[in-house]
């Protein structure tokens, strides 16, 4: 994640216009979420609570969002580590207040960030059935055993929105394909065991 720039710290100085520490605390909490950058209501609320124009409020929200995300990304949970991010000439009381607020909320923010990260689909259920597949033509009649494998897969909830996030995939496997698949899965299991034992 990109480091903070001088412009970010200049924008953070707008918090000095807040009427109370609670206003600063509320803005820090609301600016952590990724949706804050597109929220017109939060922008309007920031303008009115700090008595600043929209451009300045937008820069402040972006700087606060970037700052809180950077702290969570780097897993900085001590006041000393957070204070070290500020430039020397930054307002001392504001620096201490922001650090205190971040230390109070960092564990919640990290949990929120981890819960909202995009992940790969996960296998939630597996079922199979062995069938005899028959085919015939004028020359011969064949009976071939096949495996019908059904996997239930859960998509990342953040990508699905309102739609159900579990889908089923059914595939037909011949004995040869199943042997190849089991051999590959056996090698994967061995590699996982080797990594786990290190």
Curated annotation (Swiss-Prot):
Residue stretches making up the COMM domain: 122-196
Record's GO cellular component terms: cytoplasmic vesicle; cytosol; Golgi apparatus; nucleoplasm
PROSITE patterns: COMM
Localization, UniProt: Nucleus; Cytoplasmic vesicle
Protein keywords: Acetylation, Cytoplasmic vesicle, Ion transport, Nucleus, Sodium, Sodium transport, Transcription, Transcription regulation, Transport, Ubl conjugation pathway
Residues annotated with N-acetylalanine modification: 2
GO BP of this protein: cholesterol homeostasis; sodium ion transport
Protein family according to the UniProt entry: Belongs to the COMM domain-containing protein 9 family.
Function noted in UniProt: Scaffold protein in the commander complex that is essential for endosomal recycling of transmembrane cargos; the commander complex is composed of the CCC subcomplex and the retriever subcomplex. May modulate activity of cullin-RING E3 ubiquitin ligase (CRL) complexes. May down-regulate activation of NF-kappa-B. Modulates Na(+) transport in epithelial cells by regulation of apical cell surface expression of amiloride-sensitive sodium channel (ENaC) subunits.
PANTHER family cross-referenced by the UniProt entry: COMM DOMAIN-CONTAINING PROTEIN 9
Assembly and interaction partners: Component of the commander complex consisting of the CCC subcomplex and the retriever subcomplex. Component of the CCC (COMMD/CCDC22/CCDC93) subcomplex consisting of COMMD1, COMMD2, COMMD3, COMMD4, COMMD5, COMMD6, COMMD7, COMMD8, COMMD9, COMMD10, CCDC22 and CCDC93; within the complex forms a heterodimer with COMMD7. Interacts with RELB and NFKB1/p105. Interacts with CCDC22, CCDC93, SCNN1B, CUL1.
Protein name: COMM domain-containing protein 9
Species, as recorded: Mus musculus (Mouse)
Lineage: Eukaryota, Metazoa, Chordata, Craniata, Vertebrata
